[in-house]
């Protein structure tokens, strides 16, 4: 107990000056720790940038969770068992990427050339053919890919069934307008189409009761080998984690620069 009393007395007599007097190096570093004075203009420049970077990083994290949910929902829809395509267009439009079946007769003379595209390094087109169901409704079917040299239908007549058919594939919704500004305009007069525009395709083919969705046929082989189905691209780009890391890194870098700038100013004084 006597030792504890002596220790308390020693600590009571101790002060910052005596501590640093025994350690000159600490005296030199004291201004760096206690003399930090944020300056107005550097702060007005740095703080908004840090807040912006942190906000954008947080937004990318939210986008990451959204994209992961979208990917999971798509995979779940694709892996589910096929169902008959609903006759209610509104119901069917809520089933994008679900596997569906449809029955009807192909209107081969009204097929649409969707391109230019490529498969395995070969340039060509995707063939969208109207399918007339027993109800009279028209559903466009993306039957798959053909090489450019088979654009003439006479070179692939074997792959054009004339009677009732059953098709299975993924229900798809067309884009709302041009997917991006890099695509050329569709040319219905030349049967050159660069994105799916079902209302315009219906007008070009003089068709009525066209469904507001289409079907990507699966990879079941067609007679003659063409078209080759199964062209749906299911993968989604998901770079949000990298983007978030970039924004957070920029925020940290700006904080470091801000602190070092003020430390330099303190040292110079």
Question: Model features per residue range: what roles?
Answer:
Residues 1-2, 33:
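Accessible peptide chain termini
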Residues 6, 25:
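Localized chelating/binding microdomains
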Residues 9:
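Cationic, low-complexity basic patches in intrinsically disordered or flexible, solvent-exposed regions
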Residues 12-16, 21-24:
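Short, low-complexity intrinsically disordered segments enriched in A/P/G/S/L with frequent Arg
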Residues 30-89, 93, 97-269:
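Surface-exposed, charge/polar-rich loops and edge strands
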């Amino acid at each position: 107990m006597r030792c504890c009393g002596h220790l308390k007395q020693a600590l009571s007599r101790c002060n910052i000056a005596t501590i640093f007097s025994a350690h000159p190096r600490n005296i030199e570093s004291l201004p760096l720790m206690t003399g930090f004075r944020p300056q107005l203009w550097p702060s007005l420049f740095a703080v908004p940038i840090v807040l912006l970077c942190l906000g954008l990083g947080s937004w990318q994290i939210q986008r990451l969770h959204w994209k992961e949910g979208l990917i999971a929902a798509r995979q779940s829809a694709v892996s589910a068992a096929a169902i008959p395509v609903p006759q209610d267009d509104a119901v069917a439009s809520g089933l994008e990427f679900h596997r569906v079946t449809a029955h009807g007769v192909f209107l081969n003379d009204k097929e649409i050339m969707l391109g230019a595209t490529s498969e395995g390094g070969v340039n060509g087109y995707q063939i969208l053919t109207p399918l007339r169901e027993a109800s009279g409704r028209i559903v466009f079917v993306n039957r798959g890919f053909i090489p450019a040299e088979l654009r003439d239908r006479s070179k692939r007549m074997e792959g054009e069934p004339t009677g009732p058919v059953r098709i299975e594939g993924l229900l798809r919704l067309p884009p709302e307008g041009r997917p991006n500004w890099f695509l050329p305009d569709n040319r219905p007069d030349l049967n050159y189409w660069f994105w799916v525009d079902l209302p315009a395709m219906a007008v070009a083919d003089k068709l009525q009761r066209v469904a507001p969705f289409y079907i990507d046929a699966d990879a079941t082989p067609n007679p003659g080998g063409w078209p080759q189905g199964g062209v749906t691209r299911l993968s989604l780009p998901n770079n949000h984690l990298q983007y978030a890391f970039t924004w957070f890194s920029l925020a940290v870098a700006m904080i470091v620069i801000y602190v070092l700038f003020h430390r330099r100013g303190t040292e110079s004084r």
